[in-house]
Amino acid sequence: MTFLLLLVSVCMMATGEERTKRDVCELPFEEGPCFAAIRVYAYNAETGDCEQLTYGGCEGNGNRFATLEDCDNACARY
């Protein structure tokens, strides 16, 4: 019984983490209110591609990746 409970808990955590990754990819890109002009990549859910954009350096959301590879790895469609 304890093993079953542990197994279910692990599965729920893994599913929740995967859902969170997809949720981040569905967010619109937010450049934030600052003016740092940092080149980043964000996933565009409408086109299904990662795009290079300019991030202001503060606030924004999780749809922001340092490299194209990071963006592709996080947001590749299944």
From Swiss-Prot:
Tissue-by-tissue expression: Expressed by the venom duct.
Intrachain disulfide bonds: C25-C75, C34-C58, C50-C71
Domain of life: Eukaryota
Alphabetized InterPro entries for the sequence: Kunitz_BPTI, Kunitz_BPTI_sf, TFPI/VKTCI-like
Record-level GO cellular component terms: extracellular region
MF annotations from Gene Ontology: serine-type endopeptidase inhibitor activity; toxin activity
PROSITE patterns: BPTI_KUNITZ_2
Keyword flag Secreted: yes
UniProt keyword terms in alphabetical order: Disulfide bond, Protease inhibitor, Secreted, Serine protease inhibitor, Signal, Toxin
Residues annotated as signal peptide: 1-16
Compartments where found: Secreted
SMART domains named in the record: KU
Keyword Secreted: yes
Coarse class of the protein's main subcellular location: secreted
Chain positions listed as propeptide in the UniProt record: 17-20
Pfam families linked: Kunitz_BPTI
Site (Reactive bond for chymotrypsin): F35, A36
Occurrences of domain BPTI/Kunitz inhibitor (ranges): 25-75
Family annotation (PANTHER family): BPTI_KUNITZ INHIBITOR DOMAIN-CONTAINING PROTEIN, KUNITZ-TYPE PROTEASE INHIBITOR-RELATED
Domain notes: The cysteine framework is IX (C-C-C-C-C-C).
Family: Belongs to the venom Kunitz-type family.
Name of the protein in question: Kunitz-type serine protease inhibitor conotoxin Cal9.1a
Species for this entry: Californiconus californicus (California cone)
